[in-house]
């Protein structure tokens, strides 16, 4: 076995005389490896051999030797004897081929300029082997030759500065740089059908075609015109543009799936550097992929770190779809074509707007596969702003890799584990690859499962096409298909091992092997991971239909009583989304299971506590006075229960600070017990709080110590791509940790570049800001330059790092450098602040973002006026440096604000009249020159929830733009979801015991519910809503040099849920 050495740039070019002598020499055995191929089930069984060669001249032996070689090799032979037999056969084959090549080279040598040193480009030679006959040989042979000036003292320098169009990019590359070059594999004494299906793509034949130009942008158009299946790596390993041509679609898909496995291993190799290996091996193909292939392509590119629990309340897509259809039928009535895809009869799964003419709006894609995901949109073309009722779509100027027509932008983050054992890694990858329908050509009997409905995933898809010119849905077709998973013992064993480790299930007998569909791998393990006492406990982010499916699946065909399985889960549910559905499913599976809910403040606490050996949910619904008065008694009950349970949920309606500290201290003092703060549910009090505690035990059944990194939680995440980078960089790969660098990052970046570098600079700036100023100018030599600058937008920076689109070379220095004279946001030490101070950080950032959007959309050069209602001390003055800033407040004006202050108050019963009066006072002619800001003034000025709603309705009727930063009361679970989604059966939450979830709780001041506030503005197409999470606020706090206090960590999730910013543009 040789040590793999990657070639350098110079290794790909050898002088023509040396090249000829190499063809006359025998096959070099020192760069060759022959590896035994063994079956997974029986490692002692050898079914063939794998031949690889680490020599640039022989990287591609398939044109010479074919896809496989049949030799008579005695298994008892030693390695050296086996190699001798193979080399003898290969030399005989190469001798004939090389003789033909030498004769052709002699016949075409007249075309070589003898005044220069001819060099041979080896990648072109590999392609030349595919066309041994035909007139194309002569022309390609001439392209293979690089002429180097013989008078040049340094031939290498002349080579790098050659004017040949194929090598125009070489002047940007270090000649000693290593280039990852793929090894071509040839089977010996085996066929592709003998190879495991996840490795067949390693041996499929393909041709490498080099473009006769250095323009990579022509590659898409080139492969689109050819009839054969073709594809290319978006990040090539060599600088010359090239693509791969396959014999059939089956070969291309086999190669695609093999590269998916390699990508999975590269991405999760923690020791590999970015330059040592190409992390993303996937191909961009010239034919549409099945949806499952596209999903697989994204799935394998995600790393597997254990993520923290996050709760996302997201808007439904129905209003978005209506808005897009309206937009298409009005703004693009003559050009737009809308394609609609419904998956499993969800409200909307996919919508695409495309134009038939000039690409003013080439494509907008929206995906929703679970009805509970964050929805984004990606455009291919110029910047387009589309305002929807609930801001469900953010349009980004991005061009992402098209792995298929229906590429899901978001997929579950519960993925297969990364284990120390290579055997289990092979298991996990086999299951990942099995989600796709395998090509028929290489299906063999032992891989083809029986057609059993219970083991298949039924997917019903409805395609519709809407033509706005006629106003009707032009076509409609339905398709139902079943995805079958190969039923082999290793797939089953892997599932059983994970479920046993997470949930304590016993081994399943081989004869009763259940054939699980792939959702058990993606969801079943996530569910088991969540409810395992040794890990993070109950799941909060799963949809009920998924939980129902998993519960029914894991109890099918298992030689364990259902009641015993359920009892192992120890589900004690209350105050959990979809709790009624879970309870219903548990009782449907086993009617005798006792799903117990308890409160520590009932008459039978101690009796209940004796049986609480698993998980318990506790609700503390007494007043603060009672908590203080009976603190010792309550803590006694509380400690009794904690001694018996492995973990649970504690919900405080209105926690008393002293009692809360006692509870948290008691939880933390227990050995091996951890406490986390969750976003609160089912409460109208702004101070309600939910704690999650669990015992961090070690299960002896766990196969590896880091099993917690196996399966991440069920979350949905969007990943956008650029055309030049197909990998998905994670946050820590993109920029250093926010906690260490953000507080010292410069406030603005600028660039000066030529036109060729402009796309890179704009791409970099777009990851840190939503707006930039760019200008072009010509120097004294007549060379055009481009310059620009962008101020960092913290929210955009967070979006970029979260969605994975931030380039790894941002900021690009010295091409993009910090602007001189711009103050740095530096702070030597962190300042500890409370939750209210942290929550107030986000409001100004939202307001500034909306102001920048408003400024960018204005075409008038008139003065911009910002009117801050209730601003008082002018704290927001710094957000609008290029606008006339005026404060409306009845309080006395500060000394520095006297010249920009109006003491006559705003009339909240007559918004239009107040606006007209202020415009007359300031001499403003057009209301579109006005930007209104209401920063928390609604809370103090409006004393009834109905008044809030009325104020928003009036605000929406004004002709100016406005931003309202306010608070809403926490809604009950069903009310909260109703403000975002339609009342679909699987999203409604009906708790069984209403005593634990009353709809009203005491509130310190009257606030409207989120649903009431949304109802006031959802009918206004100009409005959008901003809301953030505690994690994002903590990131921003680190950037500005703030650290949360202990009380802030406890109460921040609840306060974040209250804080909301409405914008009307």
Curated annotation (Swiss-Prot):
Enzyme's top EC category: transferase
Effect noted on mutating residue 242 to A: Complete loss of GTP-binding activity
EC number: 2.7.7.50, 2.1.1.56
Single GO cellular component term: viral capsid
GO molecular function annotation: ATP binding; GTP binding; mRNA 5'-cap (guanine-N7-)-methyltransferase activity; mRNA guanylyltransferase activity
Major localisation: virion
Domain of life: Viruses
Impact after mutating residue 246 to A: Complete loss of GTP-binding activity
Keyword Nucleotidyltransferase (UniProt): yes
Compartments reported by the entry: Virion
Biological role stated in the UniProt entry: Outer capsid protein involved in mRNA capping. Catalyzes the last 3 enzymatic activities for formation of the 5' cap structure on the viral plus-strand transcripts, namely the RNA guanylyltransferase, RNA-7N- and RNA-2'O-methyltransferase activities.
Species of the source: Cryphonectria parasitica mycoreovirus 1 (strain 9B21)
Record protein name field: Outer capsid protein VP3
UniProt entry keywords in alphabetical sequence: ATP-binding, Capsid protein, GTP-binding, Methyltransferase, mRNA capping, mRNA processing, Multifunctional enzyme, Nucleotide-binding, Nucleotidyltransferase, S-adenosyl-L-methionine, Transferase, Virion
Pfam families, sorted: VP3-like
InterPro entries (alphabetical): VP3-like (IPR045917)
Catalytic reaction(s) noted: a 5'-end diphospho-ribonucleoside in mRNA + GTP + H(+) = a 5'-end (5'-triphosphoguanosine)-ribonucleoside in mRNA + diphosphate; a 5'-end (5'-triphosphoguanosine)-ribonucleoside in mRNA + S-adenosyl-L-methionine = a 5'-end (N(7)-methyl 5'-triphosphoguanosine)-ribonucleoside in mRNA + S-adenosyl-L-homocysteine
């Amino acid at each position: 076995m040789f040590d793999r050495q990657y070639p350098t740039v110079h290794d790909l070019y050898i002088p023509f005389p040396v090249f000829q002598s190499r063809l006359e020499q025998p096959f070099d055995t020192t760069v060759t490896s022959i590896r035994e191929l063994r079956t997974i089930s029986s490692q002692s069984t050898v079914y063939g051999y794998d031949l690889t060669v680490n020599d640039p001249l022989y990287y591609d032996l398939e044109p010479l030797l074919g896809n496989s070689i049949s030799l008579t090799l005695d298994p008892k032979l030693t390695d050296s004897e086996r190699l001798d037999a193979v080399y003898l056969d290969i030399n005989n084959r190469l001798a004939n081929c090389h003789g033909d090549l030498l004769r052709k080279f002699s016949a075409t040598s007249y075309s070589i300029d003898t005044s220069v040193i001819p060099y041979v480009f080896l990648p072109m030679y590999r392609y030349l082997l595919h066309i041994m006959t035909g007139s194309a040989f002569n022309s390609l042979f001439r392209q293979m030759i690089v002429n180097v000036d013989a008078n040049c003292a340094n031939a290498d320098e002349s080579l790098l500065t050659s004017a040949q169009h194929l090598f125009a990019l070489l002047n940007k590359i270090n000649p000693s740089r290593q280039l990852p070059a793929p090894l071509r594999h040839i089977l010996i004494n085996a066929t592709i059908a003998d190879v495991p299906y996840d490795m067949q793509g390693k041996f499929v034949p393909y041709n490498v075609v080099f473009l006769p130009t250095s323009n990579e942008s022509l590659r898409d158009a080139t492969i689109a015109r050819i009839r054969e299946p073709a594809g290319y790596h978006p990040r090539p390993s060599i600088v010359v543009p090239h693509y791969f041509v396959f014999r059939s679609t089956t070969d291309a898909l086999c190669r695609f799936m093999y590269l998916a496995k390699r990508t999975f291993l590269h991405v999760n190799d923690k020791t590999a550097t970015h330059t040592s290996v190409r992390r993303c091996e996937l191909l961009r193909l010239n034919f549409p992929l099945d949806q499952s292939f596209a999903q697989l392509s994204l799935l394998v590119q995600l790393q597997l770190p254990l993520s923290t629990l996050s709760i996302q309340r997201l808007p439904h897509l129905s209003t978005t779809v209506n808005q897009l259809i309206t937009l298409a039928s009005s703004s693009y009535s003559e050009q737009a074509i809308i394609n609609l895809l419904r998956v499993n009869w969800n409200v909307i799964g996919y919508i695409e707007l495309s134009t038939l003419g000039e690409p003013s709006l080439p494509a907008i894609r929206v995906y929703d596969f679970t009805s509970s995901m964050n929805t984004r949109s990606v455009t291919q073309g110029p910047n387009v702003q589309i305002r929807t009722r609930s801001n469900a779509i953010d349009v980004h100027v991005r061009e992402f890799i098209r792995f298929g027509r229906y590429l899901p932008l978001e997929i579950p983050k519960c993925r297969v584990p990364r284990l120390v054992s290579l055997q289990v890694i092979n298991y996990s990858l086999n299951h990942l690859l099995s989600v796709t329908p395998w090509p028929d050509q290489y299906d063999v009997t032992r891989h083809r499962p029986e057609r059993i409905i219970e083991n298949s995933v039924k997917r019903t898809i409805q395609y519709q096409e809407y033509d706005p010119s006629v106003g009707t849905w032009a076509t409609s077709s339905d398709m139902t298909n079943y995805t079958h998973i190969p039923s082999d013992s290793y797939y089953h064993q892997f599932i059983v091992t994970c479920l046993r480790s997470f949930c304590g299930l016993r081994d399943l007998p081989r004869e009763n092997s259940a054939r699980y569909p792939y959702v058990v791998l993606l969801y079943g393990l996530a569910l088991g991971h969540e409810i395992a006492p040794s890990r993070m406990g109950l799941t909060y982010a799963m949809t009920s239909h998924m939980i129902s499916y998993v519960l029914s699946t894991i109890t099918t065909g298992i030689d364990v009583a259902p009641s015993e399985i359920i009892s192992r889960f120890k589900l004690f549910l209350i105050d959990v989304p979809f709790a009624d559905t879970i309870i219903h499913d548990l009782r449907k599976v086993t009617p005798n299971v006792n799903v117990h809910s308890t409160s520590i403040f009932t008459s039978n606490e101690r009796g209940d506590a004796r049986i609480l050996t698993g998980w318990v949910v506790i609700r503390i619904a007494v007043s603060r006075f009672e908590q203080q008065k009976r603190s010792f008694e309550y803590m006694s009950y509380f400690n009794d229960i904690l001694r018996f349970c492995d973990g649970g949920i504690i919900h405080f309606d209105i926690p008393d600070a002293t009692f809360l500290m006692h509870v948290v201290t008691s939880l933390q003092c227990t050995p091996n017990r951890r406490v986390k703060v969750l976003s609160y549910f089912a409460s109208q009090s702004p101070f309600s709080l939910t704690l999650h505690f669990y015992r961090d035990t070690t299960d002896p059944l766990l196969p590896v110590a880091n099993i917690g990194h196996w399966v991440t939680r069920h979350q949905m995440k969007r990943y956008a791509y650029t055309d030049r980078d197909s990998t998905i960089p994670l946050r820590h790969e993109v920029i250093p940790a926010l906690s260490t660098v953000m507080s010292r990052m410069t406030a603005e970046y600028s660039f000066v570049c030529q036109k060729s570098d402009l796309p890179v600079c704009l791409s970099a700036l777009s990851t840190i800001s939503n707006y930039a100023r760019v200008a072009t100018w010509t120097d004294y030599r007549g060379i055009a330059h481009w310059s620009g600058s962008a101020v960092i937008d913290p929210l955009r920076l967070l979006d970029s790092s979260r969605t994975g689109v931030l380039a790894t070379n941002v900021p690009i220095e010295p091409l993009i450098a910090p602007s001189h004279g711009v103050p740095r946001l530096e702070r030597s030490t962190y300042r500890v602040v409370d939750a209210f101070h942290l929550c107030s950080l986000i409001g100004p950032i939202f307001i500034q973002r909306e102001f920048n959007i408003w400024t960018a959309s204005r075409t008038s050069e008139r003065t911009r006026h910002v009117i801050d209602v209730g601003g008082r001390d002018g704290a927001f003055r710094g957000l609008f440096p290029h606008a006339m800033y005026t404060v409306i407040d009845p309080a006395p004006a500060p000394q520095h604000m006297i010249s920009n202050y109006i003491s006559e108050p705003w009339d909240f019963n007559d918004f239009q009249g107040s606006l007209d009066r202020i415009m007359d006072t300031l001499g403003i002619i057009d209301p579109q020159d006005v930007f209104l800001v209401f920063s928390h003034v609604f809370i103090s000025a409006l004393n009834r929830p109905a008044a809030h709603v009325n104020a928003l309705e009036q605000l929406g009727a004004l002709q100016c733009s406005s931003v309202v930063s306010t608070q809403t009361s926490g809604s009950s679970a069903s009310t909260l979801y109703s403000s975002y989604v339609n009342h679909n059966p699987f999203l409604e939450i009906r708790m069984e015991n209403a005593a634990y979830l009353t709809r009203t709780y005491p509130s310190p001041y009257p606030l409207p519910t989120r649903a009431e506030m949304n109802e006031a503005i959802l009918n206004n197409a100009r409005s959008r809503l901003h809301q953030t999470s505690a994690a994002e606020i903590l990131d921003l706090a680190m950037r500005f040099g703030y650290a949360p206090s202990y009380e802030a960590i406890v109460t921040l999730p609840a306060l974040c849920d209250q804080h909301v910013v409405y914008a009307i543009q």
